[in-house]
Amino acid sequence: MNDLKPILFPGMEPRRPLVIAGPCSAETEEQVLRTARELAAEGVRIYRAGLWKPRTLPGGFEGVGAEGLAWLRRVKRETGMYTATEVATHEHVTAALAGGVDLLWIGARTAANPFA
């Protein structure tokens, strides 16, 4: 564990803990922007929001999908925060990167069963 490197983006100080915060699920543009503004006012620099939601059982809300990418771009533009979202497929990765998302992660459910 001696080879750990800090996770930094331009303009961020190397401090601990690194706080990444935001809603588990992006549901509306208003919710995303309101939450981002409140978190930015508290000094959070990385905003996370789930756009694609893996579910154990089919038929539940699976997220707003690519529609939410415009919301994250607006978060970045209006607050200066970096943005992050969970991805599960090659299509998600391609869309998120094309949409300007700064940080991607693969969740536990996805690692076990990628939106099967």
Region roles according to the model:
Residues 1-20:
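N-terminal amphipathic alpha-helix/helix-capping segment at the start of soluble metabolic enzymes
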Residues 2-3, 21, 27, 36, ...:
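Long, contiguous binding/interaction regions
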Residues 3-6, 29-31, 56-72, 89-94, ...:
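Active-site-adjacent beta->alpha loops and helix N-cap segments on the catalytic face
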Residues 10-14, 74-77, 95-98:
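Solvent-exposed alpha-helices and their adjacent loops that cap or buttress functional pockets
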Residues 11-17, 28-34, 52-57:
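Nucleotide/phosphate-binding sheet-loop regions of phosphoryl- and nucleotidyl-transfer enzymes
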Residues 18-23, 45-49, 83-85, 104-106:
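Hydrophobic faces of well-ordered beta-strands that scaffold small-molecule active sites
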Residues 43, 95-105:
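Glycine-enriched alpha-helix->loop->beta-strand junction motifs that scaffold or abut catalytic
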Residues 51-62, 77-83, 104:
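Glycine-rich phosphate-binding "P-loop"
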